[in-house]
Every structure is written in C-alpha cells, then in structure tokens.
Amino acid sequence: MSVMASDKACAPVRASRPFPKQKLRELVLQALYALEIDPEGEDSLVSLLMTEASVSKKNAAYALMFCRAIRANQPDLDALLDATIRTTTLARLTIIERNILRMMLFEHQQNQDCCPVPVAILIAETTRLIKKFSYSEGSSLILAVLGSIFDHPAPALDAPLEPTSMCG
C-alpha cells in the first residue's frame, strides 16, 4: 500500500522530547564555571552554550536561568557548605567541585516543596558529574559534604527559582 503525499501531511506531529535533566545539570555546571572564570561574560553565555554544547537557544537560556538562581543564593549556599566542610575550606576546592556542591545543594533545597529529588539520585548525579568534569579522588569529600547536609532538613532559600524549577 502506497502512502500519498497528502497522507503524510495529516500524520501527527511528534512533540519535541523534553530536555534531559542530566544534560541540563551539565549545562548549568558549565555556565557556573564560565561565570566564575569571567563574571562579566553572562551576555555571551547563551551563544557559547549553544555553540559548545550543541543545544538550542531555549535550552541554553533555561540553563542560564538556573545558573542565575544558584548565583543569587550563593552566599547562603556557601555559608552552609563552609559550616559543613571540616577538613578544608570551600575556597580550596576546585571551581568544578564548588559548583557541583552549590548546584546539587540548590537543587535539593529548591525542590523540597514541589517535587523532591531523591537523595540517591542527587548523589548519583554528583558522582557522574565529578567523573565527567573533575577527578575521582575529589569525590569522597564532595559526597561526604552532601551526605552530611542531606541528612538534615534543608533551610529555605532567599531567592527561590520560578515555579517551573527543575521538576520539568
């Protein structure tokens, strides 16, 4: 049976696939890294993410929205991290390690009310991001810090993200 051209025009259009959370976390981490290196570079960040990570403008802008929210809460996040880290200081960690901690802590705190992400998923994602962007030796400290924080109720953030959050 042959399909006529007019039949193809009536075929249902597939909705685009949702942006995977793993990819979103990678983009947010890369954006946080870029802004820590060049704090004035936010204007060119969307185009940089589009080019380097091969993502749409919409997804790059979405990642930048999370990056801005994390940076808005950075003093509170860093204070909690500084109070938890015992063997070193937050400043002595690599840029990637600091930003992985900030991002995962933010996601944990941000999503408590709407759709909490299980701690096991956050720990697994932390491990994956460390393996991909850092070195495995640093993972034990990062995981210990997050584990210690996740064992206690999450404090409220001053500048929460819009209701869309990372819930999708």
Curated annotation (Swiss-Prot):
The keyword Electron transport does not apply. InterPro entries: NusB-like_sf, NusB_fam, NusB_RsmB_TIM44. One of its GO terms (cellular component) is cytosol. Keywords: RNA-binding, Transcription, Transcription antitermination, Transcription regulation. GO terms for biological process: DNA-templated transcription termination; transcription antitermination. Belongs to the NusB family. This is Transcription antitermination protein NusB. It comes from Chlamydia trachomatis serovar A (strain ATCC VR-571B / DSM 19440 / HAR-13). The lineage of its organism: Bacteria, Pseudomonadati, Chlamydiota, Chlamydiia, Chlamydiales.
